[in-house]
Amino acid sequence: SSDDVSYYEEISELLHATGKQDMTVSNAVQSYSQKIAEQRKADMLFGVEGMSERLRWIVNKPISRDLLREKIDLCMSTSGKLRVIYQFNLPGETERDIDEFESDVEYFRAKYTTGALATTFIPNQPSAHTPFQWIVPRYSLATQARLMDLRKRFIGSGKTGLGVYLPTPLGPKNWFSQVVAEWLPVTPTLDAAIQKLPQRAEVPEMIDALAARGVRLPAAFLARDRDAVFPWSNIVTTGDDADKWKRFEGMNRKLSSERFARGTSLPSAPEI
């Protein structure tokens, strides 16, 4: 899929050479260059994951705030259009991370009087066969409410300058149904229980709502230790991390580090 692959410069060169510059592609932010920008004929998409520099560091996409602004500047000044994909409900996320995103948007709003910037937010879903499969699923209603407030504020922004669009994020009920479908067989009983879930609730309340209708999730859904057995544990994969748990522990060390607490740019700091 060209929508969820981060192409580097070599692939962009191939697209240019074969006349495929009109494909909608996602470009690795770090490799986006003036040459690539000039070759593009379709919208560019950046998948940056975290809405702040420190969250991007946590999920192993260490894109500094300065670099992100530089690459978005390059795209906006060349084509005037860009889609940026973020995740929310990431580990360690607080109001300060949304503040940083909002500040970045205001930076571009102050700089550009025309153009379109789409900022899509996807609720984090623990990824199978990655170090992040041990992240306990959560959905912050406070974060969702803040994003919806920003969405309302951005409506009509194109009439006075740079148009910023923030699509409605997937809500907790629909998100939770996707997560549960990875853990339980989809049966009429499960479907009926899912349909009765509250529209806006956090994970513990939704788990209780399922249990009240006779649907119980395995203990490993919330208790994800090193020996947890996942629904996908019997599937053998190749070419990925040899020790995923070690990488997950590294993420936890990052979360408790001074660097994460400060949230400052330290591009030369070694990875944990």
Over which residues does each language-model region extend?
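Radical SAM enzyme core and accessory elements
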Residues: 156-272
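Conserved SAM/AdoMet-binding glycine-rich loop
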Residues: 1-118, 122-127
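Generic detection of long, well-ordered alpha-helical segments
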Residues: 4-5, 95-98, 140, 144, ...
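Phosphate/diphosphate-binding loops
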Residues: 19-28, 143, 147-158
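Structural signal for hydrophobic packing residues in well-ordered secondary-structure cores
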Residues: 105, 109, 151-158, 252
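Flexible glycine/acidic-rich beta-alpha junction loops that bind and position SAM and/or redox cofactors
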Residues: 54-59, 88-96, 115-141, 160-191, ...
